[in-house]
Amino acid sequence: MIRISVDVMGGDYGPEATIAGAAIVQKHLPNVYFLFYGVDEAVKPVLKKYPCLASLSRFCSTESYTRMDEKPSQALRNGRGRSSMWYAIEAVKNGEADACISAGNTGALMAMSYFCLKMMAEAERPGIAGIWPTLRSESVVLDIGATIGASASQLVDLAVMGAGMFRTLYHTEKPSVGLLNVGVEEVKGLYAIKKAGMILREVQLEGLEYKGFVEGNDIGKGIVDVVVTEGFSGNIALKTAEGTARQIGEILNAAMRSSFFSSLGYFLSRGAFRTLRHKMDPDRVNGGVLLGLNGVVIKSHGSANASGFASAIRVAYEMVSNGLLKKITADLRRFHENKEKLFDKESEPTINNGETI
């Protein structure tokens, strides 16, 4: 039985989406047990709607929950030992749960997870990895917003962790990895990116195949399985892609309603449009993974509906059942055993100061 703790209060729709999402998963994955954390008056009425969860879940009442507009430091100070998000994370630390999921405040989730679970000894810094729909299938992109800036060593860490996540989700022996850069030529880019590329190219780390630099317009093509960048660039790329997808949808909707013949054309092509909508649906690939921590923590989109939250639960299930943490720990250990040989002894320049978003 895989145990998953859920911050029921997180996200735009709260218990209505999170508990309903758990009920969807229960139909297909009966070997999952849920620990629901939330405020009594908000959770209990919703739980009554899903008797199918009665024997496969436990509700744990909390004093408060983390608001979406709270700063990470404020959320940590106010929520420690009180909020539904904190208790869901702490359940992983205490061994009561194998993974934690929240659709709540990203900064707060990152801060609480870092404070409660601590970093893997083998990892320098956490990263958030997201699943990105592409022309081929899906790619893993990281870091999409855990921290700003990265050294060459930290970028290699992200490559190792991202490849481990891709192997876990898609059962590919050696995922292809690319570093996001301003060009594909080896002479382009900041020092940290070029240095990380040199290391990945020369060392040939087990468990991944380095393909070189990729540009922003390559992400959606799916030319590599894993795209690695620091959190500032990654977050901008993510938000740009999401905004572009929404804009295309709005333009298409307006165009299809502009005339009788446009509407007729849509009617005749509706199968193709359904395929496009399914491919680009953010709920289908919902579930960012916080990598580098001593535990599995999944961040769902705050706007996710029940179906989207169910997708995030399935990601957590795959991470646990396929041993994500063991794979990443072993891969990082192999890299760091040779780290002194790979990097210059002087301090590495970083892309910037490594601030937290």
From Swiss-Prot:
<keyword id="KW-0443">Lipid metabolism</keyword>
<comment type="similarity">
    <text>Belongs to the PlsX family.</text>
</comment>
<dbReference type="GO" id="GO:0043811">
    <property type="term" value="F:phosphate:acyl-[acyl carrier protein] acyltransferase activity"/>
</dbReference>
<dbReference type="GO" id="GO:0006633">
    <property type="term" value="P:fatty acid biosynthetic process"/>
</dbReference>
<comment type="function">
    <text>Catalyzes the reversible formation of acyl-phosphate (acyl-PO(4)) from acyl-[acyl-carrier-protein] (acyl-ACP). This enzyme utilizes acyl-ACP as fatty acyl donor, but not acyl-CoA.</text>
</comment>
<comment type="pathway">
    <text>Lipid metabolism; phospholipid metabolism.</text>
</comment>
<comment type="subunit">
    <text>Homodimer. Probably interacts with PlsY.</text>
</comment>
<keyword id="KW-0963">Cytoplasm</keyword>
<keyword id="KW-0808">Transferase</keyword>
<dbReference type="Pfam" id="PF02504">
    <property type="entry name" value="FA_synthesis"/>
</dbReference>
<dbReference type="GO" id="GO:0008654">
    <property type="term" value="P:phospholipid biosynthetic process"/>
</dbReference>
<protein>
    <recommendedName>
        <fullName>Phosphate acyltransferase</fullName>
        <ecNumber>2.3.1.274</ecNumber>
    </recommendedName>
</protein>
<keyword id="KW-0594">Phospholipid biosynthesis</keyword>
<dbReference type="InterPro" id="IPR012281">
    <property type="entry name" value="Phospholipid_synth_PlsX-like"/>
</dbReference>
<keyword id="KW-1208">Phospholipid metabolism</keyword>
<keyword id="KW-0444">Lipid biosynthesis</keyword>
<dbReference type="InterPro" id="IPR003664">
    <property type="entry name" value="FA_synthesis"/>
</dbReference>
<dbReference type="GO" id="GO:0005737">
    <property type="term" value="C:cytoplasm"/>
</dbReference>
